[in-house]
């Protein structure tokens, strides 16, 4: 029943929180505990040959009459074994080509925190509604073998939206998205008597070899985007169409004392 309710709330799957008045607005809440284990080498080398995930998540919706509010929280502890070719960033698959790699298989200990909320007004004049969505993601990741890394990744995203109800069958919406991206990556060696080899990747198969305890990297980025929605609904039929466009730019600097752009 819970999954069916969430599936039928079409606007909750869109990028516009202002569509909440058009969905089923009955209150609900749930808590989920999870455990996942993956073992084997049929994977990308950065993913590790063994992965265990323990997590807890919760979400809920409440109708406050003067506002509709939804919120969710997720925490996951992710342990990787025998992961390679990454020595600097929490997620080597997020589209950032400039990071540090090494050839030593290592364990990783990662923690993920996700906070989300949506809030919307009831319809003004039986036509207009305003909404706001917010997402905050924090990731702590630590490589367990020299050259080690302690990296902190953060994302804060806000998405205001507006909807217009023409009649019972036709609704229109528009939303704008802004995200701020930040990652602080600091490499080091526990065994200071043995220098380690590492490679500074520049993308397109280009890399520079380094020897020592690694580098400190500072990643800063922004994302802008927007989306348009159209909803056609009847008692026995409900259709939501959405088109979106995002632009993301991210830079990386090595060292805080003498910053060097990559």
Model feature map: region roles:
Residues 38-53, 104-108, 140-153, 215-219:
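Outer-membrane beta-barrel proteins
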Residues 41-46, 82-88, 141-149, 185-191, ...:
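Outer-membrane beta-barrel translocator domains and adjoining extracellular loop/strand segments
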Residues 29-37, 71-79, 132-138, 174-180, ...:
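Transmembrane beta-barrel strands of outer-membrane/channel proteins
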